[in-house]
Swiss-Prot record:
Keyword Ribosomal protein listed: no
Cofactor entry: [4Fe-4S] cluster
Binding residues annotated for [4Fe-4S] cluster 1, in chain numbering: 35, 40, 46, 273
This enzyme's EC code(s): 2.8.1.8
Keyword list, A-Z: 4Fe-4S, Cytoplasm, Iron, Iron-sulfur, Metal-binding, S-adenosyl-L-methionine, Transferase
Protein name: Lipoyl synthase
Length: 291
């Protein structure tokens, strides 16, 4: 089947020249970003603003999700000093909000949880005012791994459901209920923790299925939600079933807020970490003299 042609609202220009400074720093510190590995369409905008989502635990994933462009090979050993390098990048870039994520590392005994925790600690030691957001894998449902991450006290803990239960065959090795349980368990461990999840649209989901997932997330205590258009990285990946109109993204945002989510980012180019700093603004106290 031939791929569906992209509509006009999804024509976004990527300017490699705008990446030079950021890519130079990443190369110097031997760091990876999901922006590069996942071929994010927002890379020019974010790199131009000196923003990036750091990819720890290497560039190779142990799962075979059919929608993702991250490499699937034999994972390499962990990079010594990676957490310190991420912290150094955060400090040098002067980031007020940083997002840390990783490929799934089922080959590691704790799934990489200890590296997440160390990275948070390192960032806090050199840039204590920086808000730290983690976007974690499911750690195979291991409670001890999740506890190690929660105890590091990130400002936001994210875990993406990605799609509706009926389409979970595209998530190799994942389980819808396990992912929901992870979010719920994190809130039980730390009741004040801000939790977040994201969904890709255009994979073949129905509107009623989308709303059912929103209900499940709210029941799991998840207050933040991102909704964005799925874009197939290549013809070898899961094909796009539909390009969702911007008006529908706005409708879904209004519905999600009415259902009880605290903050929602919903638009064709929204990704998990896109405008990540906006989520915590709803929690910020008003300036003195206001409110």
């Amino acid at each position: 089947m031939d791929p569906i042609r992209k509509p006009a609202w999804l024509q976004k220009k990527i300017t490699p020249a705008a990446h030079a400074e950021m890519e130079g720093l990443l190369k110097e510190l031997r760091l990876n970003t999901v922006c590069q590995q996942a071929r994010c369409p927002n890379i020019t905008e974010c790199f131009g603003k000196r923003q990036a989502t750091f990819l720890i635990l290497g560039r190779i994933c142990t799962r075979l999700c059919s929608f993702c462009s991250v490499s699937k090979e034999t994972p390499l050993p962990l990079e010594p000093g990676e957490a310190a390098s991420v912290a150094e990048a955060v400090k040098r870039l002067g980031l007020s909000h940083v997002v840390i994520t990783s490929p799934t590392r089922d080959d590691l005994s704790d799934g990489g949880a200890s590296v997440y925790a160390e990275t948070v600690a390192r960032i806090r030691s050199v840039s204590p005012r920086t808000k730290v957001e983690l976007l974690i894998p499911d750690f195979r449902g291991e409670r001890a791994a999740l506890a190690a991450v929660v105890e590091s006290a990130p400002d936001i803990l994210g875990h993406n459901l990605e799609t509706v239960p009926r389409l979970y065959s595209i998530r190799s090795g994942a389980d819808y209920q396990r992912s929901l349980d992870l979010l719920a368990q994190a809130r039980r461990m730390a009741p004040d923790l801000n939790t977040k999840s994201g969904l890709m649209l255009g994979l073949g989901e129905e509107e009623a299925e989308l709303y059912a997932v929103m209900e499940d997330l709210l029941k799991a205590g998840c207050g933040y939600l991102s909704l964005g258009q799925y874009l197939a990285p290549s013809r070898m990946h899961h094909p796009v079933q539909r390009y969702v109109e911007p008006e529908l993204f706005e409708k879904y945002k209004e519905k999600a807020l009415a259902m009880g989510f605290e903050h929602v980012e919903s638009a064709p180019y929204v990704r998990s970490s896109y405008h990540a700093e906006n989520y915590l603004e709803v929690k910020s106290p008003p300036p003195e003299g206001e409110g």
